[in-house]
Each structure stands twice: as structure tokens, then as C-alpha cells.
Amino acid sequence: MILRTLPAAALAALIALFAAAPVSAAVPVYGYQIVHTYPHDRKAFTEGLFYLNGYLYESTGPYPRSQIRKEDLATAKVLQSRDLAPSSLFGEGIVNWKTHLVQLTWQTQIGFVYDLATFKPLKRFTYPGEGWALTQNDHELVMSDGTPAIRFLNPDSLKETHRITVTLDGRPVERLNELEWVRGEILANVWMTNYIVRINPTTGVVAGVIDLTGLLPASDQSGVTDDVLNGIAYDAKTDRLFVTGKRWPKLFEIRLVKKSQTASFTGG
């Protein structure tokens, strides 16, 4: 997503949800410790991210050259890539499923399935609404579309089976972006904020909020409004959590640290 498409009223509503409102004592708030810092391609407008077998897989926008990539974690070297065709498509979230890689596009209601090893296109599929992000839980694909809804898809037919509505203190959470399945929960970036929400996949209730304010040093920030936090990857074998952002020069392995439950959101 790019900022110019967000109406002023919608942006104001999003900021209002995360501004100056204390989180309920029932909703834990987490800060972070940086475990390790890795390089990240500053030209990569990150839309999707996952970790698999020692490598990072990343999808990037915007127009006219969206890509899917396989990258070396330690060096950020692009080992393999494929441009999204035609160039009028805006690439969005990606996820692995068995021997395939599945990709969404933003507003064209078209998704793609590739061979995971070669990035050879295998087929297209369609869905209603926008496509923002994908993850999976070993038996379903999980999709966000920029609304408070999280959709669950049959991984073979790629058709929706059910959905949940994500709420924080009873209020719907808009602009859910990049997703990752972590320890039985859905982690989701909230677009244009410094926050990741931990979502109960059965009820949609936010079980915790991760505040990543200050993660990228000011000296590394581009100053471009939409170069924001976006991108979550998880290495389940070693319990490593990675985060980055659009056109960020760094990718971080972080450890969550519980903060006071009375912490307030202070904007994004």
C-alpha cells in the first residue's frame, strides 16, 4: 500500500484508535530487545516476508516493478527473484505452502501460485476485495485485506472458508497489514503505526500489543511518510522473530519484553 491512497478521514480514524488511549489492563503491551541486526535492501518496499530453511523470502512493491525474492539473511543478497507481470500489478503478501509460493496483489483481485524452488508461475486465482498479506498455520492460509477482517483460505482451492473480525478493547482494528503465524497466534502490522498486534485466531480479540517505537534509528530513516514498519518473519525451529520495514536498511531479530499494562499508545 502507498500513502496517497489513504483518505484523510481514514488516516485520522486510524491514528485515533492508537493515540492517547490506554490499553485495557487485560491487554499486555510489549517492548523489545534487539538480538541481532541484519542488512536489508533499502530499495525494497516490503509487502510480504517469511523465513524458510535458512532464507528470507520477500515480496516488494510498488508499481511498476513488484518482485518476489529469495534472500540471504546474513547479507541481504538477492539469490533469486522474479518480477510480477504485467507491471500494472502491485505485488502484496506472500506465503509458502508445501512446494508452492502464493502471492496476492493489491487492488486487482488476482493472486498467483509459483513453484517455490524456481519461481515459475503455475496458476492464478481470484478473490474479492483487496489483498494485503498472507501467512499460514500448517492447514490454512490466513489473509488480510486492509480491513478488520482476517480471512482463512483453503490452501488447495484458495477459497475462503471463514473469517474473523479483529478487535482491541471491543473496537475493530483497521489497516491490518503484514501477517505472521507465531506460536498459535497471528501477528499483524498495523499500517502507518509502530505497532504489531497479537491476534487470537479463533475470536479475533487482540491478545497483546507490541510497541516497536524507536526500532529503526533516526539516522537510518528516509523521511518518506510511507517508509513504515512492515514485515514479520518467524523461524519456528529456533524461535527467532524478525521485523523490518518498507525501504528500511536494516532487518532486526527481536525479543519481546513485557511492559506495564497501563502503557498508552502514542501514535505511529
Which residues does each PLM region occupy?
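Conserved beta-strand positions in repeat-built beta-propeller and related beta-rich domains
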Residues: 58-62, 101-108, 143-147, 188-192, ...
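Beta-rich, blade/repeat-based domains predominating
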Residues: 42-53, 86-97, 127-140, 170-184, ...
